[in-house]
Each structure stands twice: as structure tokens, then as C-alpha cells.
UniProtKB/Swiss-Prot annotation:
Sites where the protein binds ATP: 29-32, 86-90, 413, 494
Name of the gene encoding the protein in the UniProt record: groEL
Job description of the protein: Together with its co-chaperonin GroES, plays an essential role in assisting protein folding. The GroEL-GroES system forms a nano-cage that allows encapsulation of the non-native substrate proteins and provides a physical environment optimized to promote and accelerate protein folding.
GO biological process terms held by the UniProt record: protein refolding
Organism: Mycoplasmoides gallisepticum (strain R(low / passage 15 / clone 2))
Protein name: Chaperonin GroEL
Class in the EC hierarchy, top level: isomerase
Self-association state and partner proteins as the record states: Forms a cylinder of 14 subunits composed of two heptameric rings stacked back-to-back. Interacts with the co-chaperonin GroES.
Catalytic reaction list: ATP + H2O + a folded polypeptide = ADP + phosphate + an unfolded polypeptide
EC number(s) reported in the record: 5.6.1.7
Superkingdom of the organism of origin: Bacteria
Alphabetical list of InterPro entries matching this protein: Chaperonin_Cpn60_CS, Cpn60/GroEL, Cpn60/GroEL/TCP-1, GroEL-like_apical_dom_sf, GROEL-like_equatorial_sf, TCP-1-like_intermed_sf
Subcellular location: Cytoplasm
Amino acid sequence: MAKELTFEQQARAKLLEGINKLAKAVKITAGPKGRNALIEKKYGAPLIVNDGVTIAREIELKDPVENMGAKLIAEAAISTNDIAGDGTTTATILTHEIVNKAIEAINNGTNPVNLRIGIENAAKLVSEYLTSVSKPIKSIDEITQVGAISSGSKFIGELIAKAMDIVGPSGVISIDDAKSFDTTLDTTDGLEFKGGYSSPYMVTDSEKMLSELANPKILVSLNKINTVKEILPLLEASVESSAPLLIVASDIAEDVVTALAINKLRGTLNVVSVKCAEFGEAQKNTLEDLAISVNTILVDSAAGIEFKDLELNKLGSAEKVIISKDKTTVINGACHKDVLAKYLNNLKAKSANLTSKYDKERITKRIANLSNGVAVIHVGGATEVAQKELKLRIEDALNSTKAAVEEGIVAGGGIALMNAIEVLKQVKESNPEIALGYEIVRSSLTAPARQIIENAGQNSSKIINNIINSKQLGYGYNAETNEFVNMINNGIIDPTKVTKTALEKACSVAALLITTEVAINDELKEEKPSLNHL
């Protein structure tokens, strides 16, 4: 197909148009008084969302160059969400602000390469500053605050904090649809391990890129699966029984993965294959733990167990399994309580005899993974639309809370980024074009707070100046109550990881975009006039 090429200022102008359109749609969701977006769905009712990354994923623009600009800024949001689980709106706002200012500078003759150096260096300094002021969180109240701020609901914050209290900070928390209007918390047996689906063609939810299996049969193998022939009897039995099949192995040959994916796409076989991402002894331990938790025999040549020794009724099972690209969560495995208790006691006895701190920690994690279970938040709603919207908010809040436990918290409402302005003011840079890159980032750090204030219907310039002139660390504006407060003391906080990732991804995408000199896309075909009216 022929290609269309758009160069230099014309290319940047069109890319910028796409960036501005997507950013305008996402920015309105920022803060406690952020607005909603209504998204048309191909089937069913439209989706009402207050979630930046969901909006970003849905936007497709008609003009191909504009669409490339929109996809680039969406990449900042999606990458932030993938790493930190939240912060997508902040990433979008920052990218939009930095790119607009940088392109204006380039159009006025500034060298984009030098500008890029300044932007990337500034991002590094601000990231280091955020790490230095990060405050670790430990108490249930602090965890509640993070969840409440992210979701805009104290109830959701309390629900997540309670779930974390039950399964531990690194425990497994799953989110599921409720069969009633109420949103509740439940705990069940289960575990999680590293390793996702072998092929994206195995996903059942293309929006979230997840695969979910209800009541699957589960094959667990320490042996590599080299050919389809090795497991063919089990595949045929799975088809005959209409039972979903989960295959977890130390390794799976590419030919096998391809064959399984093709049969999955054809609807012949409801199967997901997973390669355990651990190695060596850790991999063996993970597969042994999984086999116990789902009540099956581990295929292991060293122990004399081969694929031919297993029938479908000897495979394990679980109430539900959720598989992402990099992890697998097993909920309510069919393990016998007495067998699991004996297995855990053996692990504890083994741990007591170990002298290596590393080995002890590894067994402790295995015991916790097997015994803490899974906390399940069942999300209800008066309508399907309300349920979906609430589910998205809970997912964001859970991700934010996990990020806060991992790396601590900073002042929320965009204030931590504003506090970092002083760090960039102190930079002495002899190259004026690199210095301009620093200045662009510095002047963009007020953008998230400004947007939150504007979404609350207030005069952002006046409030921003008040905050800057106060020169108090953590002093900011509570958009919910319309007053100036110490943000951390009043529970208005953001996870450090989320804020850092949003800034880093925004600067990274902006730096790539401003050094773009040509946009290449498929040539648009002219639409033939319709003859329907004749």
C-alpha cells in the first residue's frame, strides 16, 4: 500500500492536534470533582468512566497523523498504568503540557535534541527528589486514605485496607462481579505465581488483556511439553467433557503453543497454557505448591510421573483462574485441607533447619502464598453500567494502594510535583537550549494541580500562586472542601511510585515526540459516493 509522508512543522502540528484532543478528553477526570466520560460500546449500554487509561484506550481519530499523536500520549498513560497501576490522568496532563511547550520552542528555532536532553535530565532530578521526600506507609488508616483518594470513596478505601490486612501487603486481592447490588469482601483459598499466558490469542477479555477460566481442569508439569502428542489424550478428554483446561509447565515448545492458540481461536478447545516464569529450584517449588493447592499429581520424570500416567479426572481444579501476561491467580483450588496442612507443616519444619537467610525467606514466602489465601472484592451495582464504573475505580484504587505500600507516599493533588519546582530552579546549565528543556518541565509541574483546581470550578491561577508563595512543603489546595491545608496531614496523598512513573513516562514520550521530523501513514483511500439514494 502507498504511504503518505508529512514533514517537520506540518507533521508536528497534526501530531499536536491529536495529542490535544485526547488530553482534553482525559483531563476532565482529574481530582475529586473530575467529570465522567461516556463511551459508546459495540454491544450493550455505554460505559460511564472516570478513568484516564480507559478513555485513552478507546480513542481513535479519523486523521491518521492526528491518531498517531493521540496514540503516543495514550502510550504515556498506558505505560504508567502497567507499571504503577494508576496515575494515567497525571501522565496525560504532563505529556500534553510538556509537548505543547516544547513544540512551540522548536517552531521558534530551538534544537529538539538539546531540548530533549534538558527534559530527560529534569525528569531524573524530579524523580530523585520525589524518592527523597517519600514517606513510608504502615498503618491501616494510611492505606485507607490512599484507597479513598484514588477512588473518591472512603468505603472503597476501607474495603481495600481490610483486604490487605487479611492477606498481607503482598497478598493476592481479586476483584469480581457480585451477584447482588452490594459490594462486599470475601476471603477464599488460593495462590498467585509468576507466569502468564503463552499467547495473547488465549485472552478472554481483550480490553484488560486477561484470560479467565471458570472451574478449569489443571495440568501441572515440571517436564517440558515438547509435542502436542504428549498431551493429546488430555486435550481430547477436555473437549469431550467441555471442561476448560489450564496447562502450567516449566516450558512449552512454540509449536505446542501455536497449536493450542489456533484451537482456542477456532473454538475447538477452551485452553490456556502458562510457562512458569521461575527458574531452577524456585520453579520446582512453585509447581509443587501449585499441584498441592489444586489437588493434582505433578508430572515429573525424575519422580517417575509422565503425561501418559494422567487422565482428566486426575488433573487438578479450581473455582476460578485469572491469567494476565505475567502472572496467574488461582482461586479456591480443590486441595484437601488435611493434605495442605501436612504440606505446610513440612515446609515449616524444613525452614527451621535452614541456616541460609535467603532460603528461609523463600520458604516463608511459599508458606504465606499457600496459607494467606485470596481476598475477593465482589463489586455490585444497581445497573450493569454502574457496576462497571465502580469496578474500574476499585481496580485503580487497589493498584494505587499496592504502589503506596511498595514505595511510600508523597503529598497529593499535584503538590509533590509543585514542590519539586525549587529543585529545578537551582540547576545551572550553560547551554541555553538544554536549559530551556529544564524550564519546560519546571513550568509544567503545576499542570496536574491546576487541572484539579479547574475541575473543581475554581480560579487556578490565584490558587497556584497562593501555594507557590507559601513556600511550605506539602501545603496545597483541598478541592473537595475548597480550603488550603497540609496535604499529607489531611490524608490527601499519592503513591510515590505513581507520581514518579507518571512524570518519567510523560517526559519519555514527550522527548521522543519532539524529535520526530516525519509522520508516515497508509494513504487514505477516497470514499466512493454512495448510490443508496438512487
